[in-house]
UniProtKB/Swiss-Prot annotation:
GO molecular function: magnesium ion binding; phosphoglucosamine mutase activity; phosphomannomutase activity
Source species: Stutzerimonas stutzeri (strain A1501) (Pseudomonas stutzeri)
Gene designation per UniProt: glmM
GO cellular component: cytosol
Protein name: Phosphoglucosamine mutase
Record CDD domains: GlmM
Cleaved signal peptide residues: none
Details of cofactor binding: Binds 1 Mg(2+) ion per subunit.
HAMAP family cross-referenced by the UniProt entry: GlmM_B
Amino acid sequence: MTRKYFGTDGIRGHVGQAPITPDFMLKLGWAAGMAFRKQGKCRILIGKDTRISGYMFESALQAGLSAAGADVLLLGPMPTPAVAYLTRTFHAEAGIVISASHNPHHDNGIKFFSGRGTKLPDEVELMIEELIDTPMTVVESAQLGKASRINDAAGRYIEFCKSSVPTSTDFSGLKLVIDCAHGATYKVAPSVFRELGAEVVVIGAQPDGLNINADVGSTHVGQLQKAVVEHGADLGIAFDGDGDRVMMVDHTGAVVDGDELLYIIATDLQERERLTGGVVGTLMSNLGLELALKAREIPFCRAKVGDRYVIAEMLDKGWVLGGENSGHIVCAQHTTTGDAIIAALQVVLALRRRGQTLAQERLAWHKCPQVLINVRFSGDRDPIAHPSVKAACDSVTERMGGRGRVLLRKSGTEPLVRVMVEGDDEIQVRGMAEELAKVVTEVCA
């Protein structure tokens, strides 16, 4: 069945443009409340990032949920994975996150977690969509839901993060720079690492509702690179606006992406005989990662891009580790979804165990040159299906002679076509990527 509102990662868009409007959020809250209270009264958690629009949408969702007879537990600004965790621990029927992840402040969105802290099954999302398009009715006054605020949510999540490493863990002597993207991790992430003994320098932790992800965070690491070098830090950690992506910077200022972090965690788990199965990556994962894991006899498979597909593949195979080069990393022995703080903890712990620097670990394997170009498009036409684009892809693939990969895909969250070319010659790879991007741009014009 075709989805009307839900995309690959919930509902997302520009604030004030349908469906990211207060009236829609009211109806969405009501529809979700009706869907989850099939068995009677229910409790639903709401968390959000630091966007100014989050407060407006929180109120609208709360009103809709209450009208459907659902009690609401308000967490305030809290990382997306924290909402998943707290939904489980409070035995709530569902959790709702108000966030547009790494997008600018003028975007916002909604994603749901089931009572188990996992992404909602497709059938539940479709049920909510059907209810949105039905007339809204309010339960009897005695059945209206109540709202309350969970004041110790941050402390609960901090302790949960720390529980993902041994109680003997001591990061004393380690100097870190943490970039919170002016987002949902700004209170909890520095506390986690400080309480484990690290010296922490914090940037990107002054949210004003408008500066989330603005030249900071996992998609804009320039300030972190500069701060790491200036402060003589051992490494830097950058989170995105909602705390489900992480990138790192070594002491020289070099960026360490999700593929490289996955390799560090995977090999550490293997050495400690705690790696169940192999590693799930995506179509965008660097070919070098696959080859490096193969050299360590660690199985590797690719899922479609998007953490929900990575998690689905992990569950299908019974594996405990997966992620994306963008920094979504899922450590299933600890969490039910991608958790940037917990992934960062596993990396730092692995470095301490091995007595290695992040720079040394970064050089442990060779990344194949990979060029990614985003091309914006509009309208309903699929540029990837255009004959000119297909012909250009076939031409590039043939010229690579089996020594690389070509991938074109539409973003699940933005009107973008992502053009990716990977191979063993950086100049050739860039030229071919630009050639393909030019064709896609012409088709989209």
